């Protein structure tokens, strides 16, 4: 059993079913992608895990035990809609939020000062939140989310509003936290981040779980047995004797790039042995679909 296990979780709002018997298991120490289009039910599930809302059916377990309000101290939650108090000073507010998570003022001050040095924001301590830019405020909220060293960290669109430099900074911190044993739920529409960061994912659409599993295994499963061939020449690829059909063939950086689909059980060695008779091959590799393509395909067909 993972750090979070949801078994047949159902949530209704009147006649509307927001979650319909959703079952997922989130392994410890991993980055787990919680995916789905707007309105799919992701936020409802996050609110249930955070004890903000209760399920109408099913069970939720935290670290092998039924989820209780006391588990919240072991969870850090960064919502998509940020919520710092604009009139409070940054340091004062951060200490207040840390105390809500069970830290003493002394512990919080020590931890915060280390984070402020790491993020190079020492001069922000006495600033009011309303004086900060959106990106600056998001840095502060990220710190307040992680400073109590939660077992489980839930990040809802954590890179939203950040410039590339700060995206890289936050991504590095997420990977460091994972390396230290923190389990992270990443809720995002950015499929590039999913491919880069996530070990496993769950895809929810229209209140139902429609896909779950390891990211690399899912990408291979939804492949079309296609290969990418970069080759020298100015004319289209000669495939008269190769067991493939051409999907596309076009100029590419001084060479040509062809995408072919294997139409038999031929091995890569057999395919290449036919191609190299008439063509100088620069590169040959399996073409694995992007998570964005899989997301669009499944959500559109569901």
Regions found by a protein language model. Give the residues of each.
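ABC transporter nucleotide-binding domains
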Residues: 2-4, 11-205, 211
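Alpha-helix N-cap/helix-start and coil->helix boundary motif
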Residues: 10, 68, 91, 184, ...
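Solvent-exposed polar/charged
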Residues: 145, 195-196, 220, 277, ...
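ABC transporter nucleotide-binding domain
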Residues: 172-260
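Short, charged/small-residue-rich alpha-helical element at the C-terminal edge
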Residues: 226-302
């Amino acid at each position: 059993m993972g750090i979070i296990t949801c078994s047949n979780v159902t949530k209704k709002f009147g006649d509307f079913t927001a979650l319909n018997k959703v079952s997922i298991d989130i392994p410890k120490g991993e980055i787990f992608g919680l995916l789905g289009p707007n309105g799919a039910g992701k936020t409802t599930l996050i609110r249930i895990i955070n004890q903000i809302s209760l399920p109408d059916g099913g069970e939720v377990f935290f670290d092998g035990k039924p989820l209780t309000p006391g588990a919240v101290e072991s969870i850090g939650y960064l919502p998509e809609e940020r919520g710092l108090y604009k009139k409070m000073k940054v340091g004062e507010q951060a200490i207040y939020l840390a105390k809500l998570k069970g830290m003493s003022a002394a512990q919080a001050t020590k931890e915060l000062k280390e984070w402020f040095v790491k993020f190079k924001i020492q001069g922000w301590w006495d600033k009011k939140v309303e004086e900060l830019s959106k990106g600056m405020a998001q840095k502060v909220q990220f710190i307040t989310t992680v400073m109590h060293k939660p077992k489980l960290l839930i990040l809802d669109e954590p890179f939203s509003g950040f410039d590339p430099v700060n995206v890289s900074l936050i991504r590095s911190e997420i990977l460091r936290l994972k390396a230290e044993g923190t389990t992270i739920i990443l809720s995002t529409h950015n499929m590039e981040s999913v491919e880069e960061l996530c070990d496993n994912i769950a895809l929810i659409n229209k209140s139902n779980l429609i896909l779950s599993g390891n990211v690399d295994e899912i990408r291979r499963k939804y492949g079309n047995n296609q290969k990418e061939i970069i080759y020298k020449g100015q004319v289209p690829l000669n495939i008269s004797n190769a067991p493939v059909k051409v999907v596309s063939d076009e100029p590419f950086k001084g060479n040509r790039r062809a995408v072919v689909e294997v139409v038999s059980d031929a091995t890569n060695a057999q395919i290449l042995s036919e191609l190299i008779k008439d063509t100088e091959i620069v590169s040959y590799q399996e073409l694995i679909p992007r998570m964005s393509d899989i997301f669009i395909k499944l959500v559109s067909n569901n």
